[in-house]
Amino acid sequence: MTIQHTQDLAQIRAMVPEMRRVKCIHFIGIGGAGMSGIAEVLLNEGYEITGSDLSENPVTERLVSKGATVFIGHQASNVEKASVVVVSTAINEENPEVMAARELRIPIVRRAEMLAELMRFRHGIAVAGTHGKTTTTALVTQIYSEAGLDPTFVNGGLVKSAGTNARLGSSRILIAEADESDASFLHLQPMVSIVTNIEADHMDTYGGDFETLKQTFIDFLHNLPFYGQAIVCIDDPVIRELIPRISRQVITYGFSDDADVRIENYHQEGQQGKFTVVRKGRANLDITLNIPGRHNALNASAAIAVATEDDIEDDAILKAMAGTQGTGRRFDHLGEFDTGNGHAMLVDDYGHHPTEVDVTIKAARSGWQDKRLVMIFQPHRYSRTRDLYDDFANVLEQVDVLIMLDVYAAGEKPIAGADGRSLCRTIRSRGKVDPIFVPEIEQLPSVLANVIQDGDLILTQGAGDVGKVAKQLANLELNINKMLG
């Protein structure tokens, strides 16, 4: 069914004239991926945007270049001009700007509430799930852009083809990553919802109860109107179990024989995945996907399912898949660098859950079977390391060389036995790989100088600051020996 998406921004804005009473929108923690995306869209819609963060980064610099005012550090005076204050769950009630906003009776809304306001009169496509949200959001965006539909998008990571994680488009389409970590995705009311998979993560939000998490995903899908569409991965056992409880139109995708949009004949050639997509009532598509891994074939088939239901031309789908550059820090091939003894291939990946690490390892093994796999892993959060300890050990022992950093706390207090040193000790006791523990990230160059060999594939893995190491290595002006100097 073809849907008309050409309504312009002026028409959308005219639907909510009251929103124009808001003059200045202030974001606390504006440098975060999710917050900055919404801030950039609102900035481009003509609102005055201010924000604060603890330090400058490329995201804050980009916002300033576009006209935002960004304060470094949190203080009460930062909110004095604000009509509304936007916060993420990382911001607590004792934050001086939150306290000042309450004192001044300035409305405080969560990030997802502001995203929901952007989506309210648009054709919203929301992408949820434990893993794959960012890449799937980028792939949906790529298809709609290739089809000339100029969508607005708000993603949790850099869409490399666009050079940003958010953009204001001219059509009524809004494609957004939906965050389940704090259950705030329940604020969204999209027309189409994708759920990629459901695993036990962020369990503190759900009282440690997996059934509560599952019900929350069902509630998210039931936010769809009765004519909306739920696009779900039938390969995921939890989703398969939940499908009978979803009272909306359900379209499935996956490798499974009973998927409505089915992947066949997947194989990987280096950086590219190649496969056939079989669709009911439509021609098969022979896909060349410019990012590797079976997990990315699943992400692509979710995007293809959405595009097929929206009657987007196959040519646009094929071009988008072949032309995608992926997303920042998702199997991000940063090139090669000089080891001093030759050259090593460098890949940076954000994955920080055992399932995400596992599929990254499998993609590396499938595409570069002749290379020794060296992983620099930084656990993310003590609570996640504790809750998934054995799963991490099972996954990490698959690599040839494991260099382990200590836990990136992300604001958490240490938990005994749930740190990098303990995880190393457990993996070493199993006898498959002898991990090297590096307590301080600054010590990595000297360790790498003694480990890296010509022809290695190096994976920097994790959601913390290990990505900074990847960027340093990717600077081809440097080699390991110069880093030591």
UniProtKB/Swiss-Prot annotation:
**EC number of this enzyme:** 6.3.2.8
Q: Main EC class of this protein? A: ligase
For this UniProt record, give its keywords in alphabetical order, as a comma-separated list.
Answer: ATP-binding, Cell cycle, Cell division, Cell shape, Cell wall biogenesis/degradation, Cytoplasm, Ligase, Nucleotide-binding, Peptidoglycan synthesis
Q: Tell where it localizes.
A: Cytoplasm
Where ATP binds, per the record, is at 129-135
Sorted alphabetically, the Gene Ontology cellular component annotations on this record are:
cytoplasm
| One of the GO biological process terms | cell wall organization
- Taken from the record, one Pfam family name reads Mur_ligase
Q: Which InterPro entries does this entry report, sorted A to Z?
A: Mur-like_cat_sf, Mur_ligase_C, Mur_ligase_C_dom_sf, Mur_ligase_cen, Mur_ligase_N, MurCDEF_pg_biosynth, UDP-N-AcMur_Ala_ligase_MurC
Predominant location: cytoplasm
Q: Which reaction does it catalyse?
A: UDP-N-acetyl-alpha-D-muramate + L-alanine + ATP = UDP-N-acetyl-alpha-D-muramoyl-L-alanine + ADP + phosphate + H(+)
Where does this protein act, in terms of pathway? Cell wall biogenesis; peptidoglycan biosynthesis
**What domain of life?**
Bacteria
* GO MF terms, alphabetically ordered: ATP binding; UDP-N-acetylmuramate-L-alanine ligase activity
Q: Keyword Cell membrane: yes or no?
A: no
SUPFAM superfamilies assigned to the protein according to its UniProt record, in alphabetical order: MurCD N-terminal domain (SSF51984), MurD-like peptide ligases, catalytic domain (SSF53623), MurD-like peptide ligases, peptide-binding domain (SSF53244)
Query: Family, per the entry?
Result: Belongs to the MurCDEF family.
Give the protein's function.
Cell wall formation.
Name under which the protein is recorded: UDP-N-acetylmuramate--L-alanine ligase
Give the species: Vibrio parahaemolyticus serotype O3:K6 (strain RIMD 2210633)
Coding gene? Answer: murC
